[in-house]
Amino acid sequence: MSHSVIKVSLSAIDQMKMTYSGSLTASVPQGAVFQAKPPGCTITAYQSGKVLFQGKNAAAESARWGTAEPQEKKKTAKKPADPRYAPPADIAGMSVIGSDEVGTGDYFGPMTVVCAYVDKTMLPLMKELGVKDSKDLKDPQIIEIARNLIKTIPYSLLVLKNEKYNSMQEKGMSQGKMKALLHNQAITHLLRKLDGVKPEAILIDQFAEPGVYFNHLKGRDIVKERTYFSTKAEGIHLAVAAASIIARYSFLMEMDKLSRAAGMTLPKGAGPHVDEAAAKLILKKGASALRTFTKLHFANTQKAQRLADKKRS
């Protein structure tokens, strides 16, 4: 598909939104200001000022607004600074425990951490089930694949609900430390489930340098043997991709529960649409309700409160 990306000011984005008002979509992707679908093109404008044009008329439509940015090279996985924790070159064919988390950047909803064990004999089946980087999958695909995975492979799931998350954060614990604790705990649980089966490697989708990760775990029993780290680990071994899919599935199920409790659909992400939803929740249930539904330390809390105050006046 032909595509083009331009960078414009927020005022230009407002002008674009007015221009395409007749073709705006009802919902927008995470982080987007608007999405429109004029003939032959899908236009998505983001809060960063970047605007993505896709479709046969992408070049012509983007030329109305600015010069396309040069396309960036696809980012590759980043290995940790300490080579001891870089995954082996042949890890893709090994029996591996993969660990990943979801929900850390979402204002509404919990943090879910999953580690999953994929024996090398199961790798062909993982591909057959459609296991791949969860960012390339839509929610209905995530749900379908995850429901097959949880019946097929050993895994450990931990859900850090919002009230507990907020309590830990208010006591001074960083999100990075929470993630380290949950990953280590999930891996420990799964190793117990495996009952003596030894994975050839443990691969964690890297969110901190290994030294920082292990420092967060001081004073605790740490799973360190054959443990490796890499960013974009979903593309390195299918165990991490499987863990990410199950974690995303769990997050979606938790969001459904929270939406039912709130009496409204709670959106993913942390953009302006989330501020609006949080303001609506404040007006409906009071500001104290946010503790149950959100990560309070996000800037969205103050923005939502201001919006709610404006709506009241």
Curated annotation (Swiss-Prot):
It is found in: Cytoplasm. Belongs to the RNase HII family. RnhC subfamily. Residues 94-310 form the RNase H type-2 domain. Pfam families: DUF3378, RNase_HII. The lineage of its organism: Bacteria, Bacillati, Bacillota, Bacilli, Bacillales. A divalent metal cation binds at residues 100-101, 205. Endonuclease that specifically degrades the RNA of RNA-DNA hybrids. GO terms for cellular component: cytoplasm; ribonuclease H2 complex. GO terms for molecular function: magnesium ion binding; RNA binding; RNA-DNA hybrid ribonuclease activity. Its cofactor is Mn(2+); Mg(2+). InterPro entries: RNase_HII/HIII, RNase_HII/HIII_dom, RNase_HIII, RNase_HIII_N, RNaseH-like_sf, RNaseH_sf, TBP_dom_sf. This is Ribonuclease HIII. Residues 63-85 are annotated as: Disordered. It catalyses: Endonucleolytic cleavage to 5'-phosphomonoester. The gene is rnhC. It comes from Bacillus subtilis (strain 168). Transmembrane segments: none annotated.
